[in-house]
Amino acid sequence: MKEIVTYKGKLCNKESDFIWGDYIEESVVKGLYHFWHHQNILARHEGMVYTDGDKYVDKDYKDSLDLHVPVSLHVPEIHNYLMQLQEVLNKYLERFPFAELSRFEIIEPLSLQHYPIGGGFKEWHTERANSSPGNVYRHLVFMTYLNDVPDGGTEWFHQDKYVPAKRGYTVIWPSDWTHFHRGVVSIHQKNLSLQGGFLSHSVL
């Protein structure tokens, strides 16, 4: 007989890979797409690889054009996205209530990432890969696909799981080494996504 365990009044799920997602509203996706193409507030830059004490461009590792967006930026596109993201997070926490053992929030900038045809985050990696505060205190990771890419998406190594890039789909997962992942490179079309992390309050 399985033991029934609850936390904060929520039933805890014993069998899961802790990778879960849901769709955000199409109007919010359109807003983010418009923001990427038309905003003139922030500068784009080539995607970088971060290691302890260093950052560099390596297109064999990550080939992208990135736009870092402070969560404090007061524009409707970002505000509306954060509201929708909170709804997806609430559903995630209903399924995995132990994820609430520590308090967390978005502190780092959001990252809008544009991948050209044949581009992507090509190497296996984790979101907690070095000793910088932004890495050490990452608790959960989120990503929203902003266009359909039938031969693109994300795959996780240990879970042997693939999530296709579907417009508006927002996926959340743990940040640590257990969830090594990489992008599935499309040879047919470009890809636009938004990524970020929830950081433990210990970083504050």
At which residue positions do the language-model features occur?
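Catalytic core of non-heme Fe(II) oxygenases with the double-stranded beta-helix
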Residues: L82-L204
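Non-heme Fe(II)/2-oxoglutarate
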Residues: K2-R103
